[in-house]
Structures are given as C-alpha cells and as structure tokens.
Amino acid sequence: MPVGNLTDQWFFLCGVDVLAPSDALGVVALGDSLTDGNISTIDAFCRWPDQLARRLVARAGRPVGVMNNGLGGNRILHDIRGDSGLRRFDCDVLAQPGVTHVIVMLGTNDPRNRWAKPEEEVTAEHMIAGLSDGHTRQLHDAPDSVLLSAF
C-alpha cells in the first residue's frame, strides 16, 4: 500500500451519528474560526468546544456530546467561505439529531470586511439586529440557547 500524506483538514467527513441514551446532552457550538480552532494546536483537542466537552462530561452526570460546527471566516450576516451563520443555523443546529443546547459565537469577521464587498459593510447595530431577528425566528424550534459575543 502506498504511503499516504497527513493533513489537518476534514475533506470528506460531513457528520457522525451515534446512539445515545435519551437523557444525553447534545451541544452544538456554531461559530467561526475561534470555534473551529484556527490557532489551536493540531490534534491537541484544546479548542474551546473540546474544553467545554471535558468539563461537561466531568460535571453533567450523564452522557454528553459537543459538536464543533465552527467554520473559519464565517460571519453572521453575509456568506463568505460558506453560508453565513444565520443561513447555517437550520442545517447545522436544528437539523442535527439529539441537540439540547446551542452556543453561538459569531461576529469577529463581520466588521472586518477584509474579504467582503463594500455593500456588505456592517455596523454593530446590523449584527445585533441580524442575531436578534434571525434567532427570534429560528429559536422557537431550537434547543436551549446561549449566545456568546466574541468581543
């Protein structure tokens, strides 16, 4: 068999379903590169969702799973390197089986506009309105939610 090349990318993995007891906690971390672990040590499992998982497992008294749905460059309002956080919410949170909680950590890339078009400039008011309006519509069907600011 030929020797393969190591990579730190997940080219083909789009999800993993597991059987879990009915009382299990299922947490989705929806965010940008800070959630994805862009500056974390590769394969060290030190990203904040990894650390959260360890703490929850130690304290919850029941099975816990934390799904890291961080996407580098992701923004709240506008698509870049994939759908915006608001557009991803349905498929990356609501469509996932067994989710009981969601943590949303988005916003660092919206005001920076490095990759954006001039018409996609946003203010803090735009971001707050986007999260408030978008999540008000989506959260009525969602699990318990926690919104985190990246600032």
Where are the model-predicted features located?
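General small-molecule cofactor/ligand-binding pocket signal
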Residues: 67-69
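N-terminal secretory targeting modules
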Residues: 1-30, 35-44, 58-61
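Active-site metal-binding loops of divalent metal-dependent hydrolases
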Residues: 32-34, 71, 108
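Alpha-helical cap/lid subdomain in secreted, periplasmic
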Residues: 43, 50, 54-62, 74, ...
